[in-house]
């Protein structure tokens, strides 16, 4: 669906207004658009993208007043992401349509990388003016595709000509993405800049105060670096880096559509770097290393050559990764073209979590837990919505690896010709994967091109093996003959490690075993070990396309997810069971999965938990356990099912749950906020083989149906959880019910403090002899926010474990001083009102209001805020329940994982 046929001119007359005490900063003006229809079809409507109006639930950031058009028709969507203009009469081939769109766009500090951003630090202020004006949507060869235009906040448009007049206050400095042709000082104390760009995808401007501009010319490109004066050394290093980087890219890929480049500093970007045509802005400081190389490569692969599908990520990200890898190799004394995984680095990113987007998380995961830990492309198999981001990860990396392996296959010089001619052929055009594969075939052969396509899209397990090794002593040397074998249609050059009887080792690099299945090597002693692909380079490449891993490992649960193998984790268990007895044992967990909720989506297939425990305090029937299995439904995008079966004498149970997510969940790494609304439907069967002397439960089987609705939100400064549930059950024709609602809020909006609020109400209707369904009150503070079934929820105050109640109303508040390592002290007060009165819901609420059974607890606590989460709490009872725990009884909670 390559786009063509429209000649577009944007003539922007705009004015910048800085932030004041009365209003937020904004940029306003008129977008004069001139479109010539060179297609064979009539244009009956136009679609314009307004990135700032991306959210239907929030006030629009771009206000559009009366739109004027030479072919006036119905106009709609002024306050939405897509503005639609009907054309009457229709614009025929060769005709021109002129549109004037007055707009006013406000800057935001929301942290969305695609929106115009305002930020201030110390004596510096920045306004990152990107995507601030209505821009024409992409026009395909088969016409408009309005169903695609709402899929992305970032505009997806076509190349056009820009002429811009920008007026700013005199005390501001500006860097613009086009070439400035005129600069005037107005009588009003403003500066007016006139600039243009004859062929580009976007227009951007960085407007700042308190910064310094460094200008230089590199290979004919006018470069402006805008940064605080405190970063003078970093700017100098950046300039030196660009002196090598830009000529290298031009040598390898030809000239980009870039005769001007602005590199600057911004705040509230929502990511470490924002890139548009001729324009790169970094959050806080310029990253001279890999990020700059990667973002600079986007001037070739994204803004000079555009993918014809906005979702075809690999043509932008993988090519940029490959380009930055090429440059990194050129800076080494000895290039190592096939080292994909670096050792585990010592880094600390926790303070930067709130500014990390999908690309940042990809890079972080590669650094911290190795490339083996990134999700594969799911081919073939069901594609569910949550796996979309996994595809982004995998294409980001798989494409880069495939390009590197293509280079190893065809050779450096041929690969250089492939890349240079591809860039030359599609400069200023749109392209797709097949276009690149055609270029590969033109410079190599059809088999290589076909194999490259396979490397991107399918499961290609080569299954390397050594069939035989024969060592014979001749002429005072050992002659070793190594016969290899493989399966699969594509085999890359492979390293071979030979170890001899004397302990000597020889590494043969990049052996083509496809054409040379037999390797002959002379050594001083016989070979005792031969290893194909010792550093698992081929496995690294193929692993990304394998839905199922090829190995199983058993290791401790240290909290880091991985896709390298089907890992089985084990960890010791020590817990108090449902009867209050201590149990110890071991828990095994495994599956294909990565779960960093709520920072990132939860991708998983076929997860399981298997637990075996023994009760220390029970002389007989003291063993038990459970198994839990969960995976997505094959037919539903946002539904996951879970099956659990367990036994702890005298209780055995079976539970089947369906977790239904309403709408698309949000994730902090992608959208700056984690949010989901989930309905969990659970049907369970519980049987007691023997009764309890205290009449807690009776023998027999009960069946329960429970509906629980959960709303969860997490951001950098505030998080909340609201839950309500209704349980219905029956046992021997006797029905029983349970209803509850709770709300928890945690805020970090006050610098240096954590503030938490909790409230809960619960009611039980149960006429059975036992009291299994009633509320049992235990003091468990809500130390951490909910994380997919792992974090305990606050549930009131402590009481005797055998004392049961039908109605409860509880609430609490805690305040603590927050540091990077710990929250100390956490001062809290919690209370509960209970009642055993029967009746309707309104009668029970009234009885709670009259009840004199009020328990209040106060105390102090300590919480760590590191990857190892520990909470220590010491309650002091203001009104002590009968049989309750002693004052200052230590409550400790501990968990390994990501702190929320």
Language-model features: where?
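Outer-membrane beta-barrel initiation region
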Residues: 494, 500-506, 510-513, 519-526, ...
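N-terminal, polar/Ser/Thr-rich
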Residues: 1-28, 449-455, 571-575
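Extended, low-hydrophobicity, Ser/Thr/Pro/Gly-biased non-transmembrane segments
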Residues: 102-206
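Beta-strand-rich binding/interaction modules
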Residues: 448-449, 462-534
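C-terminal outer-membrane beta-barrel translocator/porin domains of Gram-negative envelope proteins
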Residues: 572, 641-647, 659, 667-820, ...
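A surface-exposed beta-strand-loop module
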Residues: 54-124, 188-189, 514-525, 542
